[in-house]
């Protein structure tokens, strides 16, 4: 609808009811095609009727609207001295302005004293874009439309100097009919982009706040009579035998001469259904088709048909459009979400559109990478947090098979937490915001209504309730009967009237179970956000996934979040690093709270994703008799028989694999079977490994990809620890300064003056230690630790162990020693007083032979003290101890509350490879279940064996050195190798990152004794 502009530019500045000027109505995503062959390929930008305007544009950034030239879009305006910028792309990612990361706060807080609905005026950069486009004479009698898929956050459009229109809402499409503004030959397109506008009050998502044209820009043409919109409902019958397609087509032009043909093609291009109808006088025509023996669409089998609609004028084709469609049924029945008659569990992730190189702009390659990684990680769902994603991403979700919660572009989190005096909660029931909110939900629906993978609409995020969200909810319920509605508004008193599902983010597992058992209100329960993946996190995720199997109404969740929102940049020395909030001098900001990804900012996989993949797998293996190889296998797929995969099994020990085989299991969805591998019984510890693998390449992975796996430990800890061999006689030299135990090749020395510590181990004349052995009770704070204020709350443990330069925090003693077995074994008994307040105690027994030394440590914390981050013994070795072999859980980093994906094996790695590049340096690289480990450096060997097991952490830094650094690039040059032999380290947690402790079962409480027993082999 056309309207006049208001003088004074109030569109962006102060009037929330103006959300667009001269914009075309929102419609489904489609492109007109010239012929049937073009249309059936369904490649929008391959259409001869479309022209992408992506690429180089002239660009200049101004401080605010008062500084920008009003005539920059005039054909005569000289822009040859302007910069060139890439479109699509955020301008901050190309050297202009400051990127600003904010979670809850609005980015202008503290810099401009404004309240809703006013937009900032002093610091509100305006980017002016200019591009010249050639228009052929043949297009002058056509309808020509320009489309912007995403502009942050508002813009005016100019053609040849004339102001065409205005639009806001960053993540929604904006289209303008420019037919009357263009001319033959060169045409000047001018776009005036405002970083913030009135609509920015509705865009307080946890993300980087950027600016610019960040999605595709293109022109397309139609005849004067054209298809303006269409809606498809494609569902199978109750038996999933036949598919029924109902299509409503809206046309423009004289209906008397118009008709429409429908063709539905299968994957092989065969026509499987047809229909033809004349246009109706209301310009809405219904087409119908039945596809017999239909292939239904699901995340497991995303079969897509191609629908082509031909518009004819007096029997002659004038336009073709197409759409990939899948037949699937989504319903809530008896309080359970079902897809194609089956209960679904959403094994999902949230995903912001963010790339460390390009900001908001997402290339198709990155989109495909993300989806392929999700599929490889057993994910079946994604939530487009917190706005509609690029239409191409949804097309790819159709193609690969992901269930989508399509979230509307509305979050007003900051109005509930604002430091701005007088700032009201939005939108609530405030009438001045109704139009903007309703336009946004309508735009989301209309753009994506034909997307098969969209199974749920989300009204927005963290915006509470009120009359306006109720109207948004009712619009969807009145308009779409084929999907359910979600809204994260748990704290709102009217929450039940706004969402078809219960969705409390970051609910604890016991809260979920309580809902299922005692508080269920008839709705299914989905965790729209859970297991906050900030830094070293995602502990206890298995506590959730177990509940999804146990209670039908608990139907999954979405990890927060997919990828760290970090920006690849360079420091003042030209060194590349991944930046977070505050690194660009911006204020306010929320630091590294943007680092919540299962992938790092450069999209490398984190160990957290390995855990999620394991917990999301669709096959359970349960041991009936693991030693014999009798295993129950349960198929948790909804539609897939396990005979589509191969089960590879192997039996191994620390010496390697010694038997293996392959099976194909015929197990239908939801059913179980028992396999018997008829293994021979073995007396020592060994491991039965099961891996279910793909037989062939598919859309997202190669043949041999592991979709499910399990390991069973047989004869756990049998024959993994032997007594030290007694060989050569020993000499005990007990002088005032030291106590030494000496053999031909070994010299073990304890300091005797003040510390009474194990001070030196020499083997073959080579020193193994760089510093005395000491107790350690600290780990470098994780992001979750910081969230619980562990630095101050547990600070009594930080220096409780022996710390260089700090004396009298642990007082060691040597009580006595004795020589046994004809002088070939020495036992030294000692202890330690740990100077906590009150004091804690330790006892230690050293047993030494010429072949090694056993350390048997028992620690008795005072029960009044808070939990202990870690109980360990710490060694500093020379830095050239780099190569590590260990028998324990791996290959990835693992912790006691995040080790489901870990398998016991003999792993060869390096100390540097154990390090994990979390956005802010923190505790990392741990290994649990370690039986033995050997470090090698410069021909020296440091070998330890645990009784029966320990945790192991090896890196080049002390814990306190790590937590004093804010970026990976600032980690200092290392000069040592730090080995922590750990009795027990606390879990990493992950319920949330702003106060949630790890589960009590994973805490190191002080009402118990801790024991660490190990040997150092010479």
Predicted feature residues:
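Beta-strand/loop-rich accessory regions of lumenal/periplasmic or secreted enzymes
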Residues: 93, 102, 195, 298, ...
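Catalytic cores of secreted or luminal carbohydrate-active enzymes
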Residues: 203-227, 574-632, 636-656, 680-721, ...
């Amino acid at each position: 609808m056309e309207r006049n502009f208001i003088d004074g530019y109030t569109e962006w500045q102060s009037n929330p009811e103006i959300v667009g000027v001269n914009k075309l109505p929102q419609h489904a995503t489609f492109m007109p095609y010239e012929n049937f062959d073009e249309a059936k390929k369904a490649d929008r930008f391959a259409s001869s009727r479309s022209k992408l305007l992506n690429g180089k544009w002239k660009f200049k950034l101004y401080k605010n609207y008062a500084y920008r030239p009003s005539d920059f879009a005039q054909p005569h305006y000289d822009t040859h001295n302007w910069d060139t910028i890439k479109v699509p792309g955020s301008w901050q990612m190309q050297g202009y302005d400051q990127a600003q990361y904010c979670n809850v706060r609005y980015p202008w807080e503290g810099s401009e004293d404004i309240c809703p609905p006013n937009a900032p005026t002093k610091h509100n950069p305006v980017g002016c874009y200019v591009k010249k486009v050639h228009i052929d004479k043949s297009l002058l009698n056509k309808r020509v439309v320009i489309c912007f898929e995403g502009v942050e956050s508002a813009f005016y459009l100019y053609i040849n100097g004339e102001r065409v229109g205005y639009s806001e809402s960053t993540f929604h499409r904006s289209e303008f009919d420019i037919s009357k503004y263009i001319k033959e030959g060169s045409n000047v397109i001018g776009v005036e982009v405002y970083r913030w506008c009135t609509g920015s009050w509705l865009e307080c998502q946890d993300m980087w706040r950027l600016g610019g044209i960040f999605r595709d820009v293109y022109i397309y043409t139609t005849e004067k009579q054209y298809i303006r919109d269409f809606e498809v409902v494609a569902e199978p019958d109750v038996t999933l035998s036949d598919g029924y397609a109902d299509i409503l087509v809206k046309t423009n032009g004289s209906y008397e001469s118009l008709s429409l043909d429908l063709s539905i093609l299968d994957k092989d291009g065969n026509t499987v259904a047809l229909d033809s109808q004349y246009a109706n006088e209301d310009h809405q025509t219904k087409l119908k088709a039945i596809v017999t023996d239909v292939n239904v669409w699901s995340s497991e089998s995303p079969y897509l048909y191609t629908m082509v609609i031909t518009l004819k004028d007096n029997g002659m084709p004038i336009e073709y459009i197409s759409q990939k469609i899948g037949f699937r049924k989504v319903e809530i029945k008896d309080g359970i979400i079902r897809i194609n008659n089956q209960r679904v569990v959403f094994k999902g992730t949230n995903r912001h559109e963010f790339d460390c190189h390009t900001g908001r702009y997402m290339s198709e390659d990155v989109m495909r990478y993300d989806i392929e990684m999700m599929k490889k990680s057993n994910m079946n769902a994604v939530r487009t947090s917190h706005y509609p994603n690029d239409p191409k991403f949804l097309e790819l979700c159709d193609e690969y098979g992901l269930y989508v919660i399509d979230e509307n572009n509305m979050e007003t989190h900051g109005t509930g937490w604002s430091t701005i005096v007088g700032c009201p909660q939005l939108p609530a029931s405030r009438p001045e915001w109704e139009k903007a909110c309703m336009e946004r939900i309508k735009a989301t629906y209309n753009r994506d209504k034909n997307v098969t993978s969209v199974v749920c609409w989300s009204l927005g995020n963290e915006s509470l309730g009120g009359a306006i969200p109720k109207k948004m909810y009712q619009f969807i319920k009145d308009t779409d009967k084929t999907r359910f509605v979600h809204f994260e508004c748990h704290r709102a008193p009217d929450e039940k009237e706004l969402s078809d599902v219960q969705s409390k983010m970051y609910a604890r597992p016991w809260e979920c179970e309580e809902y299922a058992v005692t508080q269920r209100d008839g709705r299914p329960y989905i965790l729209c956000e859970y297991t906050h993946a900030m830094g070293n996190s995602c502990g206890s995720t298995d506590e959730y996934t177990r509940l999804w199997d146990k209670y039908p109404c608990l139907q999954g969740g979405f990890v927060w979040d997919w990828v760290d929102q970090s920006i690849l940049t360079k420091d003042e020395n030209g060194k590349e690093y991944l930046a977070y909030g505050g690194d660009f001098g911006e204020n306010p900001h929320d630091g590294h709270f943007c680092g919540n990804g299962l992938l790092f900012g450069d999209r490398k996989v984190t160990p957290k994703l390995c855990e999620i993949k394991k917990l999301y797998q669709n096959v359970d293996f349960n041991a009936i008799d693991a030693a014999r190889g009798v295993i129950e296998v349960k198929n948790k797929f909804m539609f897939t028989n396990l005979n589509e995969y191969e089960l590879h099994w192997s039996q191994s020990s620390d010496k390697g694999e010694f038997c293996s085989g392959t099976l194909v299991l015929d197990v239908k969805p939801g059913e179980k079977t028992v396999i018997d591998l008829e293994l021979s019984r073995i007396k020592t510890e060994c491991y039965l490994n099961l891996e279910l693998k793909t037989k062939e390449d598919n859309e997202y992975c190669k043949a041999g990809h592991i979709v499910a796996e399990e390991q069973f430990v047989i004869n756990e800890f049998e024959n993994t620890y032997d007594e030290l061999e007694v060989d050569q006689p020993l000499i005990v030299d007990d002088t005032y300064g030291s106590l030494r135990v000496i053999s031909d090749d070994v010299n073990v020395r304890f300091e005797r003056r003040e510390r009474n510590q194990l001070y030196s181990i020499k083997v073959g004349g080579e020193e193994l230690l760089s510093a005395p052995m000491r107790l350690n009770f600290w780990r470098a704070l994780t992001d979750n630790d910081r969230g619980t204020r562990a630095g101050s709350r547990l600070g009594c443990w930080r220096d409780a162990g022996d710390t260089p330069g700090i004396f009298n925090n642990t007082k060691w003693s040597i009580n006595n020693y004795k020589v046994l077995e004809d002088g070939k074994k020495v036992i030294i008994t000692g202890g330690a007083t740990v100077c906590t307040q009150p004091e804690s105690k330790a006892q230690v027994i050293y047993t030494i032979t010429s072949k090694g030394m056993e350390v048997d440590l028992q620690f008795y914390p005072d029960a009044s003290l808070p939990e202990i981050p870690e109980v360990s013994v710490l060694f500093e070795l020379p830095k050239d101890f780099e190569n590590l072999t260990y028998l324990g859980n791996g290959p990835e980093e693992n912790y006691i509350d995040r080790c489901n994906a870990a398998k016991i094996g003999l792993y060869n790695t390096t100390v540097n490879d154990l390090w994990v590049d979390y956005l802010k340096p923190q505790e990392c690289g741990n290994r649990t279940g370690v039986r033995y480990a050997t470090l090698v450096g410069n021909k020296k060997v440091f070998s330890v064996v645990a009784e029966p097991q320990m945790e192991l952490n090896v890196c080049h830094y002390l814990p306190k050195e790590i937590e004093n650094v804010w970026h990976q690039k600032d980690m200092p040059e290392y000069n040592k190798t730090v080995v922590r032999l750990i009795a027990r380290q606390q879990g990493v947690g992950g319920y949330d990152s702003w106060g949630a402790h790890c589960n009590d079962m994973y805490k190191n409480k002080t009402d118990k004794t801790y024991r660490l027993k190990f040997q150092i082999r010479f």
